[in-house]
């Protein structure tokens, strides 16, 4: 198992037109095969993903559908389509309103902040933009903290952005869950068109699940995200999360169309 630092692209204040700086972190990077640059001009992309953990299965998510899954003796191969989809199911969404050790939605500071967005026309977008601007110290290497502490400290990377976003959404009565996976970046740590580890949020609003990424609320492109697992935030490293991260160590991703 490789221990990965949760990293994000675009964590500097890009809303001010600044270029994102390269963060001095150790990151796990996957260089996709095929015409990777084409992903940035597409709305829908199909990937072939291979890895050696036969038990690991990519989830159905807001932005992705598993078209084919073949488990061989030594490895698994998945054909995955990413991009806009009609993921409307709300089954079991009630549990995504609960508090957890990291989503401490009972804390007064979290409840009061969430209340500001309850009656807005777009609470999901409003909370995403708030978190993006509120976390001003965009840095990595912070131990996983509860949302109330993140709200106070105003520091962190994609993990802290996602925890605070999910907590505020739940406190506002909107089911929300955190997702771990990879996102495609035009450039990261001197390498172009690569997938890097990332965390984001899915929120159930308006009768459907939607993707919310408070590290880049103005720059969400659904085909650039690949979800590996949902993080329960009951513990720092739940089993589904560990399995997903383990599969990253030998994964190959190829854009096929």
Predicted regions and their residues:
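Intrinsically disordered, low-complexity N-terminal segments that are enriched in acidic
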Residues: 15-88
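Hydrophobic/aromatic-rich core segments of domains that either
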Residues: 161-250
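Secondary-structure boundary elements
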Residues: 93-156, 164, 232-234, 243-257
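Short amphipathic beta-strand/extended segments with alternating polar/hydrophobic composition
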Residues: 59-60, 90-91, 210-215
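Generic recognition of flexible, low-complexity loop/linker segments
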Residues: 65-67, 116, 154, 187-190, ...
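Bacterial N-terminal signal peptides
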Residues: 2-10
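Residue-level detector of bioactive/disordered segments in secreted/extracellular proteins
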Residues: 10, 16-17, 160
């Amino acid at each position: 198992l490789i221990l990965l630092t949760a990293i994000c692209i675009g964590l500097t204040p890009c809303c001010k037109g600044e270029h994102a700086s390269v963060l001095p972190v150790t990151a796990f990077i996957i260089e996709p095969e095929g015409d990777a640059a084409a992903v940035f001009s597409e709305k829908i992309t199909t990937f072939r993903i291979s890895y050696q953990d036969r038990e690991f299965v990519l989830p159905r998510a807001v932005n992705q559908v598993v078209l084919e899954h073949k488990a061989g003796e030594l490895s698994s191969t998945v054909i995955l389509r990413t991009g806009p989809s009609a993921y409307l199911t709300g089954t079991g969404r009630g549990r995504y309103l609960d508090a957890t050790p990291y989503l401490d939605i009972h804390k007064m500071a979290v409840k009061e902040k969430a209340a500001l967005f309850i009656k807005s026309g777009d609470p999901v977008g409003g909370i995403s933009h708030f978190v993006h601007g509120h976390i001003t110290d965009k840095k990595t290497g912070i131990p996983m903290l509860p949302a109330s502490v993140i709200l106070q400290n105003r520091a962190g990377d994609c993990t802290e952005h996602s925890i605070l976003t999910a907590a505020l959404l739940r406190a506002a009565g909107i089911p929300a869950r955190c997702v771990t996976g990879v996102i495609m970046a035009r450039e990261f740590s001197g390498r172009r068109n690569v997938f890097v580890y990332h965390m984001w949020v899915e929120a159930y609003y308006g009768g459907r699940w939607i993707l919310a990424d408070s590290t880049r609320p103005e720059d969400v492109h659904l085909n650039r995200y690949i979800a590996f697992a949902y993080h329960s935030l009951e513990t720092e490293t739940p089993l589904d999360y560990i399995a997903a991260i383990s599969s990253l160590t030998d994964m190959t991703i190829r854009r096929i169309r």
